[in-house]
């Protein structure tokens, strides 16, 4: 709460105690879109470091594709401490439109045999759940709708990719922008 939420621009007030008037339910849109937000923050490597934060011979970094089907490997090769040290010094990836290679090409597939595309799954999940388009969510949050992608990003590559995928901003899936 003290590091991750502020990295998203969220600063929560101090806890004031239980409030029974708070509605604990979540919307379909939140469960379908917001809970997937972190997928673009996943990195391809699980970094493992020794006690002095050096690269270890016994416990090399593990790619997501290799470690997904063999999570016990982390314990067999050096234990959990190298993973925790690696996580402590690994910079959080940006929340953006980019999914790493292993999420785009190897998800749920046996190593060496391909797999599914997590980005495509996230987009299709939104469509299956009938969530509204990007501009509808902007308006529901009190934001003005956008008419072109340059209003969303100043990165010309991001704008070009979004234009290619969604020439009409009004038809954009809300998971991407």
Residue ranges and their predicted role:
Residues 1-177:
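Polyanionic, low-complexity segments and short acidic motifs
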